[in-house]
Amino acid sequence: RLREQYRDQIEVRIGVELGLRPHLAEYYSRFVPKYPFDMVIGSVHSVHGVDPASEKLFEGKTDAQVYRMTFEESLEDIRHFHDFDVMGHLDYVVRYGKNKEKEYSYKMFADEIDALLRELIEHGKGLELNMAGLKYGLPFAHPHPDILKRYRELGGEIVTVGADGHRPEHIAW
């Protein structure tokens, strides 16, 4: 209805963000084709079944250990499901680390990140440049600029920009 109502003023598009998990791949394979989505973002919102925003994920681990686990699990998630357009906020787990970006750089996790990027590129997937990292006090958006550069070096071509706006005041943040 909105597309029709505002067709002379703006182009209304429909998208969805899916929390990728291997056990949901079959369900998503049936869900996505049922709707006329213009954009499907595939994101990782849990690591070993725990939300990265939860302190529980970091208990007894260094930030670097959690970041590595997240990249490894993200790779497994995208290997099980390919019916999305871009991967959302690839390194957003850094927002929640005890030391944030102090235990994080592309070079520290190059093997894991490169494997992820190659998998995305092989299947024609893009990356979302998610501005929320800045909103959460990081000196960069997600993913880190070095990851975007590496994505391009490996042949990646698709980058979208998002605000991670869960509330109206966060749109176009």
Language-model segments: residues:
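Extended substrate/RNA-proximal surfaces in nucleic-acid metabolism proteins
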Residues: 1-122
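Charged catalytic cores and adjacent phosphate/nucleic-acid-binding surfaces used
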Residues: 48, 100-173
